[in-house]
Design a protein with these regions (language model features):
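Charge-dense, helix-prone N-terminal extensions
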Residues: 1-132
């Protein structure tokens, strides 16, 4: 049997969430893909406790990682500590030396422009690394 593409696997992860979290992850996914068409969808870190894996978006390295939590959808930026956040949308993992994250809760509105700016900043960090 042929393994599903990363995109199909993320579709399945979204479908399993029948509440607002699935809708939010779908919205975030669309925003990420619109920010830069060269961003690649992947599913990583499959394990017995999480057989479906974790949605990851990359471009010359990981850009952001999605987690569906009990009461939130978290978007983690592995290099977030190196990124400027003028709109202050990072709201968790603020003490980490490397990562920053955004927890989205039910009913939250998202600043799409600020989030797209963070995504593009993460892409820039990764692509600059490649040019050195």
């Amino acid at each position: 049997m042929e393994e599903k593409s990363a995109s199909q696997q993320i579709d399945d992860i979204i479908k399993v969430q029948s509440d607002w979290r699935g809708k939010k992850l779908s919205q975030l996914r669309s925003l990420i893909k619109k920010a830069d068409p060269a961003i690649v969808e992947e599913v990583k870190w499959k394990k017995p406790s999480r057989p479906e894996g974790v949605p990851v978006w990359s471009h010359d390295g990981n850009i952001c990682i999605a987690d569906i939590l009990k009461n939130a959808v978290r978007l983690t930026f592995p290099k977030g500590a190196q990124m400027k956040d003028p709109k202050k949308i990072f709201n968790t993992r603020l003490d980490s030396k490397t990562v920053r994250a955004i927890d989205f809760f039910e009913g939250d509105s998202s600043d799409s422009a600020a989030l797209q700016a963070l995504i593009l900043s993460a892409v820039k960090l990764n692509t600059q690394k490649e040019r050195r």
